[in-house]
Amino acid sequence: ASKCTIMTEAEWLNPKTGFNKANNSWMWYLPQSTEGIANLVNFAAWRSSEATWGYGGKYVFEGVTSNFYNEISDTDWRKRAFVGPDAKYADYSDITNLTAAQFANLPAYANLKFHPAEGETATYSVGNVTDIPMMRVEEMYLIEAEATAHADASAGLQLLKTFMAKRDPEFSTSAVSSADVVEEIIWNKRIELWGEGVVFYDFKRLNYSLKTGYVGTNVPSD
């Protein structure tokens, strides 16, 4: 049996090691070394909003849609991994390596999930040497919950509740039918595995749609 354990809040939001260093949750990952590290063609340079040498921390600032952010429960601590529209530095200073001045340049909804190695925000030869997550045990729990829900909605929901007890102490849902429970599971899978290249395939498999055109959207039409 796997000895992997679900990431804790402290591990998830750690500004020095969060999603840049393999831990007991990671079942499979891609390690990088200092040999051959480039400044731009690199995971952290694109994904991290703190990599000030890269596109991710200078121009792109990868993040979520406003609709996505607003749908995350305020009691779900994973929401802190994304910069709120009314964000104040004091509310994020414990989970970011940026200074107050640098933080002020982040657009709303930018991610603070992926950090440069060692929390290094200026030197690419250090900050780009991260481990890249490929498969985490959390995905396995959510796959089990979905598979169960297709056959038994109540049992699948219970598995989700057990998982969510480690993410949102006040988690609740009105989902009852198998279809609705599966949708709730996939929604939390979207939050949990954002930026890890997983849920796109769930959307294709389940024939889900993604809406980006709505009043208040932060997705440009062009």
Identify the role of each PLM range:
Residues 62-66:
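Residue-level signal for threonine
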